[in-house]
């Protein structure tokens, strides 16, 4: 184990499905000596997720981000959705679309195909299923 008050994973760019459940869950603090504590239990306190941006950016399938959000929610782990990157799922920001851009489809063997649209990082936004996910871990000093 690595001694740290908060352990986090930055899953960006998220380019495939990830299962973090073996490393999530509740932890207990144990005092091992006066003024010295250690934690027992899973290794992740916070998960940050984001798509890829910039030249040559590859799309992130929406279900990959949803899966990590759902894993975090089930385990009580803080989840922060940083960005979609250059692509946004069709229907995510219908009201801000213009008649320019490219359509693509993101899919892999485990998840169904989804239409996505090339956008600027700013226009793609930060909402996942209608809300921003700005959770931060609770730190006990």
Stretches with model-predicted labels:
Residues 1, 9-22:
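Canonical radical SAM enzyme core domain
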Residues 3-6, 43-44:
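Glycine-enriched alpha-helix->loop->beta-strand junction motifs that scaffold or abut catalytic
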Residues 1-3, 70:
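Short, surface-exposed basic-aromatic patches at helix termini and helix-loop junctions that form
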Residues 21-141:
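Auxiliary Fe-S-binding modules of radical SAM enzymes
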């Amino acid at each position: 184990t690595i001694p740290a008050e908060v352990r986090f994973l930055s899953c960006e760019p998220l380019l495939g499905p990830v299962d973090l459940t073996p490393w999530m869950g509740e932890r207990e603090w144990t005092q091992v000596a006066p003024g010295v504590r250690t934690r027992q239990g899973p290794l992740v306190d916070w998960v940050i997720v984001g798509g890829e941006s910039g030249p040559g950016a590859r799309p992130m399938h929406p279900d990959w981000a949803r899966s990590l959000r759902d894993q975090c929610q089930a385990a009580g782990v803080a989840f922060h959705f940083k960005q979609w990157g250059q692509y946004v799922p069709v229907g995510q920001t219908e009201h801000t679309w213009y008649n320019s851009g490219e359509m693509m489809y993101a899919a892999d063997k485990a998840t169904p195909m989804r239409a996505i649209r090339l956008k600027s990082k700013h226009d793609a936004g930060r909402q996942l299923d209608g809300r921003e996910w700005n959770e931060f871990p609770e730190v006990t000093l």
